[in-house]
Amino acid sequence: MRASLFPLSTSKETPADAEIVSHQLMLRAGMIRKLAAGLYTWTPLGLRVLRKVEQIVREEMDRAGAHELLMPAVQPAELWQESTRWDKYGPELLRLKDRHERDFCFGPTHEEVITDYVRREVKSYRQLPLNLYQIQTKFRDEIRPRFGVMRAREFLMKDAYSFHLDDDCLARTYQVMYETYTRIFERTGLVFRAVAADSGNIGGSVSHEFHVLAESGEDAVAFSDESDYAANVELAEAVAPAGEAPPPAETMRRVDTPGARTIDDLVRDYGLPIEKTVKTLVVHGADGGLVALLVRGDHSLNDVKATTLPQVAEPLVMAGEEEIRAAVGAGPGSLGPVELPLPCVVDRSVAVMSDFAAGANQDDAHYFGINWGRDVALPEVADLREVVAGDPSPDGRGTLEIARGIEVGHIFQLGREYSEKMKATVLNEAGDAQTVTMGCYGIGVSRVVAAAIEQNHDDNGIIWPAPIAPFQLALVPIGMNRSEAVTEQAEKLYAELQAEGVEVFFDDRDARPGVKFADMELIGIPHRLVIGDRGLKNGVVEYRGRRDSESTDVPLAELSAFLRERLG
């Protein structure tokens, strides 16, 4: 591609409303242009990258035996009412009416549509298993779209749905899709982790997320430094400490603590080690009352784990100060297990503490030197806290590391969440109607592009992994309009590289070398060749990889072999 014929539009300025690196660089490189909040036009440059990601996804899905189809983006309300999601989904669902006042929505997902398709088309168990996918535009009406295409309202997604006669068959296909996703993200050249995850609004039981690791990631993932264990921090098990609580060394005493409302206040004002403190958090109970959850002072309550407790209401709701005072007679900063008139659950780490400090259930007072059994009965024990770096890995191999991740893929074993409600059945071998079981597998195709930039950039711009770069090689002639030798060699090389199938961006613009170099670094082309009079006199061209700190002179006679090695 000749730059003189390509609509390249770069900028030195960072847009004021672009908060994260990928948004900034995609705008500066001219990959996207904002139309409205959360809506973007993909320019020819950006679309080349998007199509590369899409092609990798399509090739691997086809290789896995899935079949591509295309469903309507606009969906009738009746299907969503069948699944009961019409009223549950919330304002993110863009609802609209046609000229006949019939209700529709712009699909954020397609579980209902695909289930309707299968219940109409698939009649016999002999037609199963069946795995169907599409790559299509989705819309979610985010309350605050931000971060460019990372959290846009309109986005490109690959969504796949598998149908099975039984759970064993679903589990086999799920494993195939897990391996397929692993190949997809390996092929994009990104560093990622597959983690056990919560199913969220989609529903179902078994679930894994695929995260591209990047400091700007919204999610925290935990993974072992010695094994393949990885999980979303929300689901990662905090292993119970070994052994029992040490024997008491102190006598419990009540201490006036005026103004001490937080753990930090206690640690600062009374010289307590934070790991010797306990905080008491009060939440709404499933029976309409309140429940106290106790975690160590330096630990954080894990909301997902708390919600799984049968005595805790779902969704998790923290009790307000008035509710707490009405039940206990003290404010939330003065609560503890001794004579607490609420049902309690304590974290595993709290259960093995001795001589610890907690609120006295009176304002401005705490108990120091509390011990289980002697001063208060040990209540129910559960895994309540979020894991931290250095915790033992739950699989017994190594310790946990915590990293930020950007979710780019999610796979679910849905089970019969949708098929039962929508009566999707087939005739089994005995001739009886049997409800099918389902799997669901999504990849945010446009989000992968942004995540790749978050993971691969420097101060000068994007550093594309080679498999998804818009072009493989930038050919940059210097003084082309003034030197016949440069023009002749550049044109010759351009023709040869094209003939070999190399995706070349030939910067034949009448621009200063500095402008050309800055643009090529900004848009992130992995390889660059510079042709100039000085080099040609010595029979060489200058090569530089996008990640290289120095350039290399390559003899023209060796260039073909050199590039074959570099370009793979």
Curated annotation (Swiss-Prot):
Q: Where in the cell is it found?
A: Cytoplasm
Primary site of residence: cytoplasm
Q: What class of enzyme is it?
A: ligase
Q: What is its EC number?
A: 6.1.1.15
Molecular function per GO: aminoacyl-tRNA deacylase activity; ATP binding; proline-tRNA ligase activity
Can the keyword Lipid metabolism be found in this entry's annotation? Answer: no
Biological process (GO) annotations? prolyl-tRNA aminoacylation
The record's listing under PANTHER family reads: MITOCHONDRIAL RIBOSOME PROTEIN L39/PROLYL-TRNA LIGASE FAMILY MEMBER, PROLINE--TRNA LIGASE
Description of how the protein assembles with itself and partners: Homodimer.
What this protein is called in its record is Proline--tRNA ligase
The source organism is: Alkalilimnicola ehrlichii (strain ATCC BAA-1101 / DSM 17681 / MLHE-1)
